[in-house]
Amino acid sequence: MKNIMKLASIALVLLFTLFGLTNKASAAKLTLYCSVEIDVCEMLEQAYEKETGTKVAMTRASSGETFAKIKAESSNPKGDVWFGGTGDPHLTAAQENLTAEYKSKHFNDLLPAAQNQAVNANYKSVGIYVGALGFGYNKELLAKKGLPAPKSWMDLTKPIYKGEIQIANPNSSGTAYTTLATIIQIFGEEKGWDYMKALHMNINTYTKSGSAPIKATGRGENLIGICFQHDGVKQTKKGLPVVTVSPEEGTGYEVGSMSIIAGARNMKEAKKFYDWALSPPIQTMVFTSGKSLQVPSNTKAQADPDAPDLSTINLIDYNFKVYGDKSTRAGLLSKWDNDVSVIPR
């Protein structure tokens, strides 16, 4: 009898162990590639895990780096969703069939710019937020150096600002690529490249991340940082002496985007996250947290009261379809590499 009871106990232990292992193995998973600020990425990761029980593996990298990663992994995709970063590389990814078609149930509630992003990408991407381009300067450092406050794109090419400006590298940064595309659209092809060469002479560092220049400006390590305006305002909200500028000539803007990676291993979970991230409660959570000051794409979501008011900014008619085209993008980056970045400063 004792042997029978002992065998029964062992069988029960094995059964529960097997059940636990099976249950663990079948737990939902999601691999998230995230191209917004790390604190927002972590907030999304933790909130989704808590709400759904899904185990999220998140990697944070700039939009250019993430695009390159997805392209390199295309024969054996490892990611499921790409969240954030400027819309241009998302459009390029869609054109190269690196992302999958999916139309969210929240589509009709989105801003026109976010819907246009989806249409231009054949529903292989969608807009999740909107943010205007600009630059910021450290007002304390400006006063110390006795320099005038810059107000326009052209001001940034003046010799008085030599060695005083930072911008990211457009090969790795969506912010910098948007800047390049904006300048070409404002000034035209020939004058636009002349502008980029003149700006290059005033750059002290090309960073990898688009938000790094304005962070350095906030810390007093750099005078002027070219950035999205919400990133400048974020530094000011932290109590740092940053003044954000909307250039007088007008400026471009981003439609920060999200895409499902083609061949995603967890496609069902990817679509679930996609809808979740576009829902009013989640967009309100993200964009009123103080960690992200862009304008949310869902019209039923709330924005942070300190987010830049796009209606007061002179936004150009940015051509996302043209500048998100893979050949246009490759051509601009190649010309910048060969004709601008190599000029001795």
Positions of the model-derived regions?
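A ligand-binding cleft/hinge motif common to bilobed small-molecule-binding domains
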Residues: 88-92, 218, 223-241
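Mature extracytoplasmic/periplasmic domains
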Residues: 261-320
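Periplasmic-binding protein-like
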Residues: 195-200, 206-207, 238-262, 299
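Short beta-strand->loop
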Residues: 100-109, 125, 154, 240-252, ...
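A bilobed periplasmic-binding-protein/Venus flytrap-type ligand-binding module shared by bacterial periplasmic
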Residues: 136-141, 181, 255-266, 285-288
